[in-house]
Amino acid sequence: MDEPMVDASGAQVKVTFTTTEADLQLPESKRQLLVPADIRRYGLSRVLNSESMLDTGSIPFDFLVNGSFLRTSLEDYLTNNGLSLESNLTLQYVRSLIPPVYEASFEHDDWVSAVDVLSASSPSGRWSGDNFQRGQDRILSASFDGLLRIWNASGQVIATSPSGSHGGHTASIKAAKFLTNSQLASAGMDRTVRVWKYTESDHFSGDLKPTLELYGHTGSIDSLEVDGASKRILTASADGSIGFWSTSKASAPEADSSLLPNAHTSKRRKVTTSVTAAQRGPLSLMPIHSAPASAAVFDPRDRTVAYSASQDHTLRTIDLTTSTVVTTHSTSHPLLSLCALPRGNSASPLLAAGTAARHITLVDPRASAATTSVMTLRGHANKPVGLCASPRNEYALVSGAHDGTCRVWDLRSVRPATQEEGGLGSVSEAVYVIEREGAKGGKKTVAGEGCKVFGVVWDAELGIVSGAEDKRVQINAGRDVVAE
């Protein structure tokens, strides 16, 4: 064991350092140490980074004690938990989550319903292959005014989609995603999915051209997920159905003629547009929910598997090759949002689902799972309607909610549920809260009044990007939210 460190009072605490991070393991002989009782997180980080320990320079660390992050001195922790200075504390060290810092806001004419990012490290950037040029990051926003906008990182609008009379959406857009740097998809209250070709003549101006209209849903489409590699789209609709679509005109089946825009319009009132895009139907339309379907996502490792969440309280696993439900997990509340969290080498992800009860429930979708809910994330004061996994850390995710905040969660920080919370299972609380910049300091009679967050994405290059009722896209630097 290393030589003991002594503080001014002379009090010391024996600690044992552990970690699950393979590249940060200490030799067995260095894992136990006597440290000053008044030492805090920063001091412990310095100890670990020192030449005699990890010799890692200046990596910021957080420390978990019995599942909770250390936020006081060791002495205060011992006192607060009824422990003596003679106790041997086991400290699990992890790379810190660094506070996301506000960077910019992009103004819109109406509420911003959805956002996405195209960057070198984003899924769409990777699907673009060599066609994507590093440094040409783009932000996609969808709005209740029925328009899509593509921005550069400096806040300049590069392209805006045409209006409904020119081939665009005829009602509010609820979801939008980049497929590649030259293709994107959107969907909304006009019950259609639209695929767009995106081109740039230079780095400051571009063009969005509708190439495909997909018909099948009979209700608003509130969620859209894409896989650029397989050219497939998943949708979740208020009609209770999950849609599975192709972005290729050649492989997409014909659309149901009764759902096309002119199907119920007299010859005198035919809807005409100046742009004609091909009209197609779904590869599969699965009416598997008894209430509005809120979200659908692909399995991170197996794109033939999908998961859906619904206001009917269920989360379902779908085999896309046969369009059948494999498993159904029932929950206690209507589900409003969904994201899949990859788990190390595990074949199955962990699913995070936002609920109408204002919390986020983590679900193990495996049929063999002993319990449906693995953990509950608590802290939002209104409905969490947007979720996104960290691009770099399998334990972290961000949520956006109608309380006007985005919250960053670290799943390694866990405590038992209190009696007020039902007394069962594990609970995690947000490590950081991101407020809307324009609402800071203002008092709201209802949580999130005027600034409800509708969508959020976490990108390794640009950070945490969110869209809200305040008619703004907000960027909070997140490149180093997870310390390297």
From Swiss-Prot:
Return the SUPFAM superfamilies for the record: WD40 repeat-like
- Record has rRNA processing as a keyword: yes
Q: Where is this region: Ubiquitin-like (UBL) domain?
A: 13-95
Q: Which GO terms describe its cellular component?
A: nucleoplasm; PeBoW complex; preribosome, large subunit precursor
Per UniProt, subcellular location reads as: Nucleus, Nucleolus; Nucleus, Nucleoplasm
Give the matching PROSITE patterns.
Answer: WD_REPEATS_1, WD_REPEATS_2, WD_REPEATS_REGION
Where are the bilayer-spanning segments? none
Write down the Gene3D superfamilies for this protein, in alphabetical order: YVTN repeat-like/Quinoprotein amine dehydrogenase
* Role description: Component of the NOP7 complex, which is required for maturation of the 25S and 5.8S ribosomal RNAs and formation of the 60S ribosome.
Task: Give the similarity note.
Answer: Belongs to the WD repeat WDR12/YTM1 family.
- What is the designated name of this protein? Ribosome biogenesis protein YTM1
Q: Which organism is it from?
A: Chaetomium globosum (strain ATCC 6205 / CBS 148.51 / DSM 1962 / NBRC 6347 / NRRL 1970) (Soil fungus)
The encoding gene is YTM1
